[in-house]
C-alpha cells in the first residue's frame, strides 16, 4: 500500500510517500523565517506561503516518484488554520481527481500521536500526550479508531507559552528550541507554582505564563537564563504530574508522546522514566510532517480491512 501524506495545518508544508510503514521520502518547507519578525504565525501570510511551497514540493515530488503508483492520498483535514488547511485540501483534491485515487482525511492531532508508529509499534491501550504550538492534550487510546481526550489545556498551548516567554525575555522565535538549549546548560532555581484545574488531567499553561511574566516585570536584576530554565522545569514538572496520574488511572501498555514540543530534550529525559514502554517519534517526525499523515491513514485503512 503506497500513500501520499499532505500536511499544511499551520506553517509547515510537507508531503511524504509511505509504502506500508516505510517512509520512501519526505519533502518539507518551513515558514519560520517568514514569521520570525512577527513573533508568531500570521494566518494570511501562512496561506500564501503554502500556495507557493506546495507547488515547489509537487515539482520535486514528480521528479522523484511516479504518482500513478499511489494507492491513496491522505491530507490534514483538521484542526489548524482555516486557510492553510484549505490549501492542502485543494491540492489533495486536485491530485485525487487527476490520478483517480481515493482521498483520506486525517485529524492532525491523531497524526501526532501515531507518528511514533513510523519507527515503533504502539501497544494498546495507550496513554498519549500531544504537545505543540497550538495544542496540548492527553489521549486514552483503545485502538487505532478509538481515541478519547481525557485531558486538555483550558487556555494556552505549551508551545505557544514557550514562544511568549521567549519573546518576553528577548530570546527569539520559536522559543522552544532556544529555552531547551539554555536549560541544558543551567538548572534554574526560581520556584513557580503549578496551577490546579477542576478536572485533574486538564492543563492551565496560562497560569504558569502569568507567573513568569509577572516575575520578569517585577525583577530589577533579571537573570534571563535562570528564568528560562526555571520556566521550562515548571512546565515539565506539570506535564509529568498529569501523566503519572493518567497512567495510574488507565494502566496503559504504552505511553506515547508526540507533537513539536516532544523534541524537547529534558521532556524526553523525564518522561522516559514514567513507564516501561515510552515511545517518542524520531526528531524529524515531531514537527508537522507529511509522514505522520500517511502513517495514520495506513493504520486506519489496515484496521478497517
From Swiss-Prot:
Keyword field: Acyltransferase, Cytoplasm, Iron, Metal-binding, Transferase, tRNA processing
Positions that bind substrate: 130-134, 163, 176, 180, 264
GO cellular component, one term: cytoplasm
Cofactors demanded by this protein: Fe(2+)
The UniProt record lists the keyword Metal-binding: yes
Reactions accelerated catalytically: L-threonylcarbamoyladenylate + adenosine(37) in tRNA = N(6)-L-threonylcarbamoyladenosine(37) in tRNA + AMP + H(+)
EC number: 2.3.1.234
Residues binding Fe cation: 108, 112, 288
Protein name: tRNA N6-adenosine threonylcarbamoyltransferase
Function, in words: Required for the formation of a threonylcarbamoyl group on adenosine at position 37 (t(6)A37) in tRNAs that read codons beginning with adenine. Is involved in the transfer of the threonylcarbamoyl moiety of threonylcarbamoyl-AMP (TC-AMP) to the N6 group of A37, together with TsaE and TsaB. TsaD likely plays a direct catalytic role in this reaction.
Pfam families, alphabetized: TsaD
Family per record: Belongs to the KAE1 / TsaD family.
Subcellular location as annotated: Cytoplasm
Enzymatic class: transferase
Gene3D superfamilies per the UniProt record, alphabetical: 3.30.420.40
Native species: Mycoplasma mobile (strain ATCC 43663 / 163K / NCTC 11711)
GO molecular function: iron ion binding; N(6)-L-threonylcarbamoyladenine synthase activity
Record's cofactor remark: Binds 1 Fe(2+) ion per subunit.
Keyword Ion transport: no
BP GO annotations: tRNA threonylcarbamoyladenosine modification
Amino acid at each position: 500500500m503506497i500513500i501520499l501524506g499532505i500536511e499544511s495545518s499551520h506553517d509547515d508544508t510537507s508531503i511524504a510517500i509511505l509504502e506500508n510503514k516505510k517512509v520512501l521520502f519526505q519533502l518539507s518547507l518551513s515558514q519560520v523565517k517568514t514569521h520570525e519578525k512577527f513573533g508568531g504565525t500570521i494566518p494570511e501570510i501562512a496561506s500564501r506561503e503554502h500556495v507557493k511551497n506546495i507547488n515547489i514540493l509537487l515539482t520535486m515530488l514528480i521528479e522523484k516518484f511516479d504518482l500513478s503508483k499511489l494507492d491513496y492520498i491522505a491530507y490534514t483535514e483538521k484542526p489548524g488554520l482555516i486557510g492553510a488547511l484549505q490549501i492542502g485540501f485543494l491540492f489533495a483534491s486536485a491530485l485525487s481527481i487527476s490520478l483517480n485515487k481515493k482521498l483520506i482525511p486525517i485529524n492532525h492531532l491523531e497524526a501526532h500521536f501515531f507518528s511514533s508508529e513510523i519507527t515503533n509499534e504502539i501497544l494498546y491501550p495507550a496513554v498519549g500526550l500531544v504537545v505543540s504550538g497550538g495544542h496540548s492534550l492527553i489521549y486514552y487510546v483503545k485502538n487505532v479508531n478509538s481515541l478519547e481526550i481525557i485531558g486538555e489545556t483550558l487556555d494556552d498551548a505549551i508551545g505557544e507559552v514557550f514562544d511568549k516567554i521567549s519573546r518576553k525575555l528577548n530570546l527569539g522565535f520559536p522559543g522552544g528550541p532556544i529555552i531547551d538549549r539554555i536549560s541544558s546548560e543551567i538548572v534554574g532555581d526560581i520556584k513557580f507554582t503549578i496551577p490546579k484545574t477542576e478536572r485533574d488531567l486538564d492543563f492551565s499553561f496560562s497560569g504558569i505564563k502569568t507567573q513568569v511574566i509577572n516575575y520578569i516585570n517585577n525583577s530589577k536584576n533579571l537573570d534571563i537564563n535562570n528564568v528560562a530554565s526555571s520556566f521550562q522545569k515548571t512546565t515539565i514538572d506539570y506535564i509529568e504530574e498529569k501523566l503519572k496520574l493518567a497512567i495510574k488511572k488507565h494502566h496503559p501498555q504504552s505511553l506515547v508522546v508526540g507533537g513539536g514540543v516532544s523534541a524537547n530534550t529534558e521532556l524526553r529525559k523525564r518522561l522516559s522514566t514514567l513507564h516501561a514502554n515510552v515511545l517518542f517519534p524520531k526528531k524529524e517526525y515531531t514537527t508537522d510532517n507529511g509522514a505522520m499523515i500517511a502513517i495514520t491513514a495506513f493504520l486506519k485503512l489496515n484496521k478497517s480491512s
